Amino acid sequence: MFQDIGPYVFHNEYSSRKPEEDDILIVQKGRDILMNCGQTLPTVAQVRAVCSLAAEQAYYLLSIDEKHFFCTDVQVPETENLSYTSVMILREMNPGYMGFGGSVSWQLASWYDLHRYCGRCGTKTEHSERERAIICPKCGHTYYPRISPVVIIAIVDGDRILLTRYNRGGYRRHSLVAGFVEIGETLEDAVRREVMEEVGLHVKDIRYCESQPWPFSSSLIAGFFADVDGDPTVHLNTDGQDELAEGVWVSRDELVLEDSGMSLTWDMIRKFKEKHPISTIA
């Protein structure tokens, strides 16, 4: 999957290290990220040549082996060799470890950008010098990176799996039922609620499969398998806010793997097709 970058080693522990010229410098602008014309992430030296202030005000994010990633709050203008493009391009970047490192760096850079001012008192915030955190110098409130829990569910009816297709957005391939965990819910509660809300089914024998960090939505996704409990007829949500355009049962023999396996969704679908055992936990 996307985060499987071995033999490279991902280091997300905080460090106060300073940038060097060949380190990677992440510059984000909303859902876009600054890239070289060759679709590689720019170095500190390359950004410095365009905007020296951006390089001087860079701060450390993470490392993969000896490749260090930094970001800056300073907006860098586009040039003939540097331009902003959708962060989703990192999903298919080669080598894959750079795509993963770049996307997690974009996630952190976006979080820093959203917390430039204290949400409690409005004072300009500061970076902690002891941990990855943002501190308000006036009221003392501390902010930590946001991670939103998500569940994704492979709903099974014997030799069939339920595939869905989103009603909106750019992703047009089949997917699985998924959604954010609400306050006060267990992961298992979220599984039952999302399945009922989106496809009108009851499920049983909920069993954990695996998880995946997904930087593009600042999420940690927990994947579950669950069996249909009762009538398998799909009833898509029609309250005017329906997320799904389609929900269809597909047999194991008919199942075609549409994705490269970068996402948890298609890793779970592959496991179903190949009959991987998933133990019951709830």
Q: Which functions belong to the PLM regions below?
A:
Residues 28-29, 133-176, 180, 202-203, ...:
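N-terminal strand-loop-strand
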Residues 1-96, 277-282:
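N-terminal alpha-helical interaction blocks
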Residues 22-24, 151, 222:
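Residue-level detector of short, conserved catalytic/binding motifs and their immediate flanks
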Residues 92-103, 107:
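Short, charged surface segments at domain edges that flank catalytic/cofactor-binding sites
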Residues 32-36, 67-73, 160-165, 176, ...:
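Short, well-ordered strand-loop elements centered on a beta-strand within folded domains, enriched
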Residues 103-154:
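Cys/His-rich short segments
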Residues 53-92, 181-282:
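Unchanged
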Residues 114, 149, 157-158, 170, ...:
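A generic structural signal for well-ordered coil/turn residues at beta-strand boundaries
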